[in-house]
């Protein structure tokens, strides 16, 4: 399958591109800096189009022009090349124009939907629209259009946050659920609106308090009690993805006596999986990343190096680890990671805790070299 993703470099776009490529699809990425000629060329080859491009922060006039124009440019390109392939579209719940959603952004998204449905009627193509509420997860740009991303970024750094409208209720979908919905929508055989999971609901003040509780636990090394797949577990995974590199290290206190030494790694009353990894000299392990699973690596024998690189970035973060200086390293979601034995003749023994049990049906593990 060859897929065209417009808005490919945005928050949802980056996740969708990774998911499509992991499934074996060829993906053409179209961004705001590309021209109509490139769009037309991509449309000629596409088996399916995911239309994510749009404008969400601008003047009322720019919102209307930007979102409607993006839809018109896509339909013009598809019409020009005569390709009635399926089109999957991300819109917004604000397109309902109900209550506080009766605004310029909502009107621009509604008009964009209308452009695409008219194209569907004229061309015979299937157009499926997903009206999304707020979406949260790793890789979302802070201080822009997401209160979750903004709060996570600031709180992870110990910075103050401005909590406005504390009682306002947010409706949120987790990014993995959105990607699953987009991929499911690609199988739809008629035009219309796609069903979505029930969104999580949380007040702004509650969101801030929960994230601040994660920060408080961070210094103590205590893991919060999280039900796998719950809204809170997904919020915590999101929070971890915003930690600055220096916050990934967990210094540990070592207690010595005549019997040897003792150090407490973590405290938790539930969840996760602990494994022991033995790596031979010069050998790398890992070379993959996870969407939501996060891990903690702790060297108990030998010495080695942890290498981390955020997916899509080129900067590699390196931590030298030695059993003589007990230190644990957090591996956040969305980071390619590898463990390398740097000793010449000693095995590297590492205790690894993972936030989720391994599920062969949904391993949440994506191969990538670092």
PLM region descriptions:
Residues 3-19:
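N-terminal Rossmann NAD(P)H-binding glycine-rich loop of SDR-like oxidoreductase domains
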Residues 34-84, 94-100:
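NAD(P)H-binding glycine-rich loop region in Rossmannoid oxidoreductase-like domains
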Residues 117-129, 133-170, 175-186:
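NAD(P)-dependent short-chain dehydrogenase/reductase
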Residues 311-333:
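Short acidic-glycine-tyrosine-enriched beta hairpin
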Residues 313-314, 342-370:
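Double-stranded beta-helix
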């Amino acid at each position: 399958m060859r897929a065209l993703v417009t808005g490919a470099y945005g928050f949802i776009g980056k996740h969708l591109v990774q998911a499509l490529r992991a499934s074996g699809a060829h993906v053409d990425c179209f961004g705001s800096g590309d021209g109509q000629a490139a769009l037309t060329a991509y449309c000629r080859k596409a088996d399916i189009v995911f239309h994510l491009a749009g404008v969400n922060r601008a003047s009322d006039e720019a919102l209307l022009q930007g979102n409607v124009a993006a839809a018109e440019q896509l339909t013009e390109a598809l019409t020009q090349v005569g390709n009635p392939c399926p089109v999957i579209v991300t819109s917004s719940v604000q397109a309902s124009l109900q209550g506080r959603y009766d605004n310029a952004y909502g009107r621009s998204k509604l008009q964009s939907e209308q452009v695409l449905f008219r194209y569907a009627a004229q061309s015979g193509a299937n157009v499926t629209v997903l009206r999304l509420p707020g979406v949260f997860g790793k890789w979302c740009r802070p201080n822009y259009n997401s209160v979750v991303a903004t709060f996570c970024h600031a709180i992870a750094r110990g910075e103050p946050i401005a909590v406005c409208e504390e009682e306002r209720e947010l409706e949120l979908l987790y990014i993995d659920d959105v990607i699953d919905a987009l991929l499911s929508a690609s199988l739809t055989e008629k035009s219309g609106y796609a069903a979505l999971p029930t969104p999580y609901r949380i007040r702004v003040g509650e969101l801030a308090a929960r994230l601040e509780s994660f920060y408080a636990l961070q210094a103590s090394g205590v893991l919060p009690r999280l039900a796998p797949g719950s809204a809170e577990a997904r919020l915590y995974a999101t929070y971890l993805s915003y930690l600055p590199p220096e916050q990934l290290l967990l210094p540990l206190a070592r207690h010595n006596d005549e019997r040897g030494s003792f150090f407490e790694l973590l405290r938790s009353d539930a969840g996760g999986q602990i494994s022991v990894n033995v790596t031979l000299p010069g050998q790398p392990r890992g070379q993959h990343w996870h969407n939501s699973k996060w891990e903690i690596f702790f060297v108990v024998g030998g010495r080695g190096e942890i290498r981390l690189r955020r997916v899509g970035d080129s900067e590699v973060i390196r931590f030298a680890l030695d059993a003589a200086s007990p230190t644990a390293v957090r591996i956040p979601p969305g980071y390619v990671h590898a463990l390398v034995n740097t000793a010449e003749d000693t095995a590297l023994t590492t205790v690894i805790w993972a936030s989720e049990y391994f599920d062969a049906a949904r391993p949440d593990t994506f191969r990538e070299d670092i």
